[in-house]
């Protein structure tokens, strides 16, 4: 599925809205994607994950050990991408306002992670989540999102993975 076909499917299911929107960040946009609505359709969620997963495979060439996502927005798409890549999935959740790895999730120090979000606007949730993974001894080697409104500019750079 190419990008044009995906956009058409998102419009058809009512998830892609066009007009004038003020985002929660205060930024303005001419389009708004209701990710929860798009991902509530299992076939569409799988197509979105396949589209992102193919790009991830091209860019990371089997260097990822785990897929991780911050709850809530990244949960469904993160799990779908992990299934496409045949990798373990885990998520971070907020406890008293801070992200934590809970529910028995664990990993070996030095493991490489791919962070998945539904939408990245300011990147603040991603930055917080990446810091937690790094503090626990993991390496976030990349991030993917359905929608990137950040302009590709993150304020935080994760350490580079060790070449193997």
Residue ranges and their predicted role:
Residues 77-114, 122-128:
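Short, glycine/charge-rich flexible loops or terminal/linker lids adjacent to PRPP-binding catalytic cores
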Residues 156-163:
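Conserved small/polar residues in nucleotide/adenosyl-binding loops
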């Amino acid at each position: 599925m190419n990008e044009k076909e995906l956009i058409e499917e998102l419009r058809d299911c009512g998830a892609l809205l066009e007009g004038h929107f003020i985002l929660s960040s205060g930024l303005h946009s001419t389009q708004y994607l209701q990710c929860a609505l798009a991902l509530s359709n299992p076939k569409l969620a799988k197509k979105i994950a396949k589209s992102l997963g193919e790009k991830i495979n091209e860019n990371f060439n089997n260097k990822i050990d785990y897929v991780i996502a911050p709850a809530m927005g990244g949960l469904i798409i993160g799990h779908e991408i992990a299934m496409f890549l045949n990798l373990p999935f885990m998520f971070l959740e907020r406890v008293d306002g801070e992200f934590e790895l809970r529910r028995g999730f664990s990993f070996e120090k030095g493991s490489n992670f791919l962070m998945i979000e539904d939408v990245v606007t300011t990147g603040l949730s991603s930055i917080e989540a990446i810091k937690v993974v790094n503090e626990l001894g993991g390496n976030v080697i990349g991030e993917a999102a359905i929608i990137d409104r950040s302009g590709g500019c993150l304020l935080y750079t994760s350490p580079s993975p060790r070449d193997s």
